[in-house]
Amino acid sequence: MLRAALSGSSYVGVFATATDEYLLVRPDIEESLQSEFETELDVTAVPTTIAGSGTVGSLAVGNENGLLVTERVTDRERDRLETETGLPVVELPGNINAAGNVVLANNEGAFVHPDLSRDALSAIEEALSVPVERGRIADVQTVGTAAVVTDDGVLSHPKTTDEKLDFLEELFGVYADIGTINYGGPLVGSGLVANNTGYIAGEETTGPELGRIEDALGFIQ
C-alpha cells in the first residue's frame, strides 16, 4: 500500500495507469516517487505524455494483450509506448476518446461508455482481446473514473447497485464491492492505481477506505 500525490493532486488515477507488466505515469514524476511506485506495483515505470498531456491515466488503459489510447496520441508517443511495453498500441476513435476515462478493463472483459460507436468497440476489442459491454456505473458514463478493476477484484462507486456489482463480477470474473477514495470521493478510478501486486491511493485516502480497497481488490484473503 502506498498513499501519494502526483503534481500536488491526490487524484493519482488521472496521471497514472498500471497493469502487471508496466506503469504509465506523467513525465514530471520525481525519481524517488517513481521508485516507490515501481516497488509497490512490482513493475517498471514508463514516464510519458499522451497527446502532449500528463493525464495519462485518463487517456490510456491496457491489459496483458495491448494498450488502448486516445486517437490524439502522437506518432512519437505511440512508438515509445510500443517499445517500452512490448505491446501493440491501438487508438480509440471518435469524439469520446479519453480511453482511461471511458474504458474499464482487465484480462477477462471490458466495460465501456454507453455512447461509444461500433468503430470504437472494434478498436477496444482489437486492443484488449476481451469481450466488451457498454453501460453506466451509478449513472456515471465515464466508467473508468467510477471503478478500478484488476484480475483479483473490482472497487466501484459507492452508489453502485447490487445488480450492477453482480454484472461486473460476471464480466470481469472477480469479486466486486463498493468504496470511496480521498476522504469520501466517489470516483474511485480517479484516485487509485492498482494491479494484482499492490496499489497506490491518493494521499487523502483514509484508513477505513484503505480497508475497503484491500478487501475489494483481494489484498485481504
Curated annotation (Swiss-Prot):
Which pairs of positions does the record mark as disulfide bonds?
none
Q: Does the keyword Protein biosynthesis apply?
A: yes
Pfam families referenced in this protein's UniProt entry, alphabetically: eIF-6
Listed A to Z, the keywords are: Initiation factor, Protein biosynthesis
Q: Which SUPFAM superfamilies match?
A: Pentein
| One Gene Ontology MF term | ribosome binding
What's an example GO BP annotation here?
A: cytosolic ribosome assembly
The record ties this protein, via InterPro entries, to:
eIF6
Q: What does this protein do?
A: Binds to the 50S ribosomal subunit and prevents its association with the 30S ribosomal subunit to form the 70S initiation complex.
Family that this chain belongs to: Belongs to the eIF-6 family.
PANTHER family assigned? TRANSLATION INITIATION FACTOR 6
- What is the protein's given name? Translation initiation factor 6
Q: Which organism is it from?
A: Natronomonas pharaonis (strain ATCC 35678 / DSM 2160 / CIP 103997 / JCM 8858 / NBRC 14720 / NCIMB 2260 / Gabara)
